[in-house]
Amino acid sequence: MSQNVLVVHGGGPTAVINASLYGVIEEAKRNPEVGKVYGAIGGTGAIFSETFIDLTSFNDEKLKLLLHTPASAIGSSRYPLYEKDYEKMVDIFKKHDIKYVLLNGGNGTMDACGHIYEVCKDQDIKVVGIPKTIDNDIAMTDHSPGYGSAARFIAASTQEVGEDVKSLPIHVCIMEAMGRNAGWITAASALARRKQGDAPHLIYLPERNFNEDEFLEDVAALQKKQGGVVVLVSEGLHDENGESIVPPIFKSERAVYYGDVSSHLANLVVKKLGIKARSEKPGLCGRASVALQSSVDREEARQA
């Protein structure tokens, strides 16, 4: 009997999640006991609709394109799972002779992976989690695939914006980085600094409480000294009470969709300090950029 593999993507994609997918197919082809490698089309919900694609049916030339393709080639989701759902999965896995279930995602996906493992451990079905998140906040990992490319993007973007602001030093530019409650991406902007005075000039992380008055004082002092100022802020900034400095747009099961922190702070600078300011929010560009994909990140994702 063939032992098939099922790969499921969960949560937000990255610039290298497809490299992990390629790595799975590559390794499966080396093992004669493995039959097909299925991809769940559209994430976790595809398990219940049994919407699978046979990834081993593609030739090597096409599969290698995955290494340099952004986002998720098989689709992802934030499909909510409940206790009753996990038992249903076992029957579906058996129906398709799936002996290996590989879930590629962040914290929410790893949580689901644990639940699926519990219902499969006595059914001779192996469940494995493949780490993925630009936020770099998965427990017990030094760093996760996806973060390196996002870090490279924000560092390169900060360096370029810094040169722009330096050449016309008349305003404050506030750049907002993704990462939710983790400041790893925002902190990576410091890699743009090559010499004293280079951007970013100020960095604000969600690991510390944010004080608007102190922020305005910092900006005013630097702007008076050097003219142009580049500030990096995290989308997850919060005050001393733990409240987001900008109310979230909305919340779903596990995810919080933050408001425009950079726009809010730029408006504060204009209104309170009378200084020209603008906001930049790369957003999804920062996790989808293949142009700035890290080769190290890609190889680590492939091996993950």
What are these regions, as identified by a protein language model?
Residues 4-8, 65-76, 132-142, 167-171, ...:
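Gly-rich Lys/Arg/Thr-decorated short loops/hinges at beta-loop-alpha junctions or inter-strand turns
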Residues 269-304:
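C-terminal active-site/capping subdomain that shapes the small-molecule cofactor and substrate pocket
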Residues 10-12, 40-45, 78-79, 106-107, ...:
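Short, ordered loop/turn segments at secondary-structure junctions
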Residues 47-99, 108-110, 134, 145-152, ...:
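Glycine-rich oxoanion-binding loops at beta->alpha junctions
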Residues 14-24, 47-48, 82-87, 106-115, ...:
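Short glycine/serine/threonine-rich phosphate/pyrophosphate-binding segments
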Residues 4-14, 72-76, 99-104, 172-177, ...:
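Short glycine-rich or small-residue beta-strand-to-loop segments that form or flank ligand, phosphate
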Residues 103-105, 111-115, 119-120, 124, ...:
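Accessory alpha-helical/coil subdomains and C-terminal extensions
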